[in-house]
Amino acid sequence: MFLLSVFFPLLGGLVNTSPIARFLGHRGSSIIAIGCMVVAFISSVVIYYEVVFMGCAVSVDVFGTWFSVGTFHAGWTFNFDLLTANMLFTVTGVSMAVHMYACDYMRQDPHLNLFLGYLSYFTGFMCVLVAADNLLVMLVGWEGIGVCSYLLIGYWSHRLSAVKSAQKAILVNRVSDGLLMWGVLWVWYHLGSLEYDLLNVYSASGFVGLSILIGAMGKSAQILFHVWLADAMEGPTPVSALIHAATLVTAGVYLLVRLHIHDEMFVIIVGSLTAFMAGVFGATQSDLKRVIAYSTCSQLGYMMVSLGLGETGGEASMGHLMTHASFKAALFLAAGMVISGNGGNQHIARYGGSAHSAMFTMLTLMVASLSLIGWPELSGFYSKETILNLAAICADPIADVAHTLLLLTAMLTSAYTTKLFYQCFMVDFSGSSVTPVRNVLPILAMAILLLDIMLKVWVGTNLLSGMLFFLPWGVKTLPFGLMVAGILTATAAVGSERFTLIRFCGSRWGFDQLFARSPVNPIFDLGRITWAIGDRGLLSVGNLRA
């Protein structure tokens, strides 16, 4: 039962990418993909019950010794502890909803079986990463989700923008992944083992901790490595939902929690700058999916700040990761319905007037948006408020600055989320009419999970009771006040040039231009020179001699 949650998504991917899939048709491929994900999710629920409620952590040796090099023996072992159980439940639950949604959303695509196969592989490798008991098996899942993200972002290969975005994502992650690999090799050289138990103390210091931290920054799109995240929206909407909710971008945060890497100063600085930067970018975007993408980047910044606040911060970070998975999946799936109903148009300034014709979509997007901004009695409120409270009580000047930046980010989040919702449904525009996708069950499930009542069912108590530790009245109420201020500001400024900040912010602070002019273009120029002088020259000389 424990292995089903890991291997069944991979099985679904194997079937749908094999020659057998051409005989299954769209219906057969959909049944295979959804069926495998349902089995994986049910297995994850059983694991969650056994580990969380019964306290039965399990370690499963799958293949024995994978390979041996001298005294080093690599084992293929999965460890199902509390952290793994929570992550598997989140990953398989969100992925099952995305698979159901994708079967309907992509029903006109001639290669639906291939798309579903890539989605299943994506989920399967994420489950391998989550359940891995050592760094070597973790790297298999880590590289697997990287390859799958490249295939899915560039799935519409007839679009040049999609191909370039896929290349950008894989190249940026190659830089951070290279440092992660170097750190793993360093650990193997000095310890002779890659087991997590030995790493929890060793990897938290020095070069190893920094290299693993930078590897996590790349996957989780932190500042300097964030440039690929918004461009990844060129892929189909189900891909965006899966990347942002439960798989790729959460892998970095999970790895840091797993290895207990909490370099307080560096992590807090990186997380707070990322959160604020992404908040500014989100407020200056007009593309629906890019606005949601920058909200993901911003929330990942919250999680990174929380990681720098000690062991309690690690727990708060994982709590926010789980709630974020639900409301971000609901946001993207509802956004997909809006986009499909507007003929593929993603420019929110051209939306509006569809509140009556798309009531279900409007309500779903509203609940998910309120959870994103941290409205009371929704799941996002509890997880975000916990992080803000931890930053407020931390006796460190850097934490005080981070707390201020997170508060400003909360205001920006409220502003651009209100702008998005208002432009989609409240502005009169006769050309907008959303046609709901037939399969609304996945979105409904994600929206229900955002309600506090469902959290009480799962946890067994009111989460608010665990948050009532003493804090000054102003500290507790300031986030809510800033959230309301952001909503009012956005409502007053929608449709006005005042809401469009300076062009510098709209161009994302010039990071793309900076990277293009400094490391990227010179490398491309060098490649063209070596091709012209070396490859083409040698080949032409060889042909003449022949």
Swiss-Prot record:
Query: One GO cellular component from the entry?
Result: mitochondrial inner membrane
**Principal localization?**
mitochondrion
Give the EC number: 7.1.1.2
Name one molecular function that GO assigns to this entry.
NADH dehydrogenase (ubiquinone) activity
**TM region(s), chain numbering:** 1-21, 31-51, 52-72, 82-102, 112-132, 135-155, 175-195, 198-218, 237-257, 264-284, 291-310, 321-341, 358-378, 387-407, 440-460, 468-488
> Which compartment or compartments is the protein found in?
Mitochondrion inner membrane
Which principal EC class is assigned to this enzyme?
translocase
Keyword set, alphabetical order = Electron transport, Membrane, Mitochondrion, Mitochondrion inner membrane, NAD, Respiratory chain, Translocase, Transmembrane, Transmembrane helix, Transport, Ubiquinone
Topological category with respect to the lipid bilayer: Multi-pass membrane protein
**Single GO BP term:** ATP synthesis coupled electron transport
> According to the lineage, what is the superkingdom?
Eukaryota
Per the entry, what this protein does is: Core subunit of the mitochondrial membrane respiratory chain NADH dehydrogenase (Complex I) that is believed to belong to the minimal assembly required for catalysis. Complex I functions in the transfer of electrons from NADH to the respiratory chain. The immediate electron acceptor for the enzyme is believed to be ubiquinone.
Family the entry assigns = Belongs to the complex I subunit 5 family.
Provide the protein name: NADH-ubiquinone oxidoreductase chain 5
Q: What is the lineage of its organism?
A: Eukaryota, Viridiplantae, Chlorophyta, core chlorophytes, Chlorophyceae
Which gene is transcribed and translated to give this protein?
A: ND5
